[in-house]
UniProtKB/Swiss-Prot annotation:
Probably a riboflavin-binding protein that interacts with the energy-coupling factor (ECF) ABC-transporter complex. Unlike classic ABC transporters this ECF transporter provides the energy necessary to transport a number of different substrates. The substrates themselves are bound by transmembrane, not extracytoplasmic soluble proteins. Mediates riboflavin uptake, probably also transports FMN and roseoflavin. Keywords: Cell membrane, Membrane, Transmembrane, Transmembrane helix, Transport. It comes from the Bacteria. Inhibited by FMN and roseoflavin. This is Riboflavin transporter RibU. It comes from Lactococcus lactis subsp. cremoris (strain NZ9000). GO terms for molecular function: riboflavin transmembrane transporter activity. Disruption phenotype: Mutant exhibits altered transcriptional control of the riboflavin biosynthesis operon in response to riboflavin and FMN, and does not consume riboflavin from the growth medium. InterPro entries: ECF_trnsprt_substrate-spec (IPR024529), RibU (IPR025720). Induction: Induced by riboflavin deficiency. Riboflavin is stacked with one or more Trp residues in the binding pocket of RibU. Belongs to the prokaryotic riboflavin transporter (P-RFT) (TC 2.A.87) family. It is found in: Cell membrane.
């Protein structure tokens, strides 16, 4: 693939990924938890990973994240949430790619998806405790500890208060993210199957 064609494909996938961030295309998963919604912007990024390579996939993810800041900035929810999203999705796609880069089979894809989902969910839980929730509490006045009982204060980091809330983590963060990554896996798996069958695009070792 020529350098020009590669750059055009990166730009197109980044643009498509950004379009999928439109609020109208997002949807909640858990009843009563409207502040956490699924967006499918990772799908074009995964297509980039498996057609161009992991490095270009991260470039697409980075461009999408920058455009998210510029086009859909909603204050603290954006500047706190986007870095978390970048880290978790980066881990997810890197693990899936690692297990399928030699051969894209159902077995390898399933193993990759399961391990990637577990890793990404754990990372999101840790980031919620030590990064997101303290910042939301300070910058936006949003304190989940007032909604979900059972929080334990851990320590202070300057003006940030770090707490551990097992109720919120186990009933919201864990199921939401697990379901979200399962949706990503099913949608991308379907796309790979359709693209392979119709020879729309060549995936790595697929």
């Amino acid at each position: 693939m020529s350098k020009t064609r590669r750059m055009v494909l990166i730009a197109m996938l980044a643009a498509l990924s950004t379009i999928l961030l439109l609020p109208i295309l997002q949807f909640p998963l858990l009843p009563g938890i409207d502040f956490m919604k699924v967006e499918l912007s990772i799908i074009p990024v995964l297509i980039g990973v498996f057609t161009l390579g992991l490095g270009d996939g991260f470039i697409i993810l980075f461009i999408r994240s920058v455009l998210w800041y510029l086009l859909f900035n909603q204050g603290p929810s954006t500047w706190i949430g986007v870095p978390m999203n970048f880290v978790a999705l980066g881990i997810f796609m890197a693990i899936v790619w690692f297990f399928t880069k030699k051969k894209f089979s159902i077995k390898n894809y399933t193993v990759g998806i399961v391990l990637a989902t577990i890793a990404s969910v754990l990372v999101m839980m840790v980031l919620n405790v030590f990064y997101a929730l303290p910042l939301y509490r300070l910058a936006a006045g949003f304190d989940v500890d007032k909604i979900f009982a059972g929080a334990t204060h851990l320590f202070n980091m300057g003006s940030l208060s770090v707490t551990l809330n097992p109720t919120y983590l186990l009933t919201v963060v864990l199921p939401f993210n697990a379901l979200q990554y399962i949706i990503f896996a099913l949608v991308f798996g379907l796309i790979v199957t359709v693209f392979k069958k119709n020879k729309v695009v060549k995936f790595y070792n697929a």
